Amino acid sequence: MEQQGTNPPFIVTDGLTKTYIRREKPEHGGITRLWRRETREGQALRDVSFRIGRGELVGLIGPNGAGKSTLVKLMTGILTPTSGSCTVDGRTPWAERKAHVRSLGAVFGQRMQLWWDVPIRDSFDLLRDIYSIDEGRYRRRLDELTAALDLGDIMQSPLRQLSLGQRMRAELCGSLLHEPELLFLDEPTIGLDAVSKLKLREFLRVENETRRTTILLTTHDMEDMRALCSRVMVLGHGQLLYDGTLTNLLHRYDTAHTLTVTYDGAADASKLPQGAVKDGDTWRITLQKDGDLSRTMQQVMAAGKMHEMAIEEQNVDELIARMYREMAL
C-alpha cells in the first residue's frame, strides 16, 4: 500500500476481518429440507489494515458489496469483528460504544436523523438534549452552522417541506452540532444539483481545515473525490486494494476518456477516428492517454462543423472495474 497517513494515528485497524454465516435451503432432501438448513461462510472484510491521522479527509470507494458498509459499522461500533482490531482515538468502538458515539457524526444520503414532521430548529433542540450539549456552546455552534449552511430562512420548516439540497444541509448541521471528532459521510451529494454540490463541498473543506474534523467519505462521484480527498482507499471483495493519493490512482487506472461530439448537420463518418460510435446525434470517441490527441482532434474537426464537444472521464465504477481486471479479481 502506498500510504497509511502522515499525521499521528487517529483511526487504527489491524487485520480487521468480519465473517458471516449464511443459511441456505438444501436443493434436495424431501420433507427434511423444511427444517434443515445448509450454512455457508462468507467474508465481508478480510485482513484490512490502515492508519488515518487526525484531521484527514479520506475517500472510501468500491462497488456495492465491497465491504464499505461493514467497515463503517465496525468503526462506529455497530458490529463486532470476527478477528482483528480497530481503535478510534484509542477507543475500541464496539467495547466502548456509549462514549464512542458521542464523538461521531454521520450523514447518509438516503437516511435521515432529523424528524420528518418537525421544524428543523426543534430537531436541533432535541439533538442538543440527546448529546447533553451546554446551552451556550449549543447556541454558538448552531449560529455558526446556520450561517455557514445558509439555514436561516428554513429553520421553522419541517424536513418534509425542504428540497433535497436543503435537507442535506440540515442533516449536516444536525450531525455537527455536538462538534464530533469523526464524521462519516455516505454519498452526501447524491441527487443534488451542481450549485448545491459546490456549496456542500466547500463547506466540508472548510470544516475539515478549520476544525480538523476527521472525515471519511464514501462516494461514487469522482468530482467529490477530486474536490475533497487527497487520499482514497479502495475496497473490493472485502479487501483493501489501494490506499494512496487520488492522483496516483487515476494515473495508474484511468487510462482512457471518452470524447463526445455533436455536429451541425451530418458528419462525414469516413473522416472520424477508427472506433467512433454514433449514439443518437452524438459521436463517441475513445481517447487513450498515450494516444495522439492532436491527430484525433484533426480528424474530428475534418468530419464536419462541430456544434458541441466534451470529454467524459471514467466514473468510479469503471475505474474499479479496470482495477479488478488487472488484479484478476
Mark where each language-model region is:
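Conserved ABC ATPase signature
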Residues: P158-L162
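Helix-to-loop junction immediately C-terminal to a conserved catalytic motif
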Residues: T76
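Conserved ABC transporter NBD signature motif
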Residues: G84-A95, H100-V101
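ABC transporter nucleotide-binding domain
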Residues: R201-L287
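Short, charged/small-residue-rich alpha-helical element at the C-terminal edge
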Residues: H257-L329
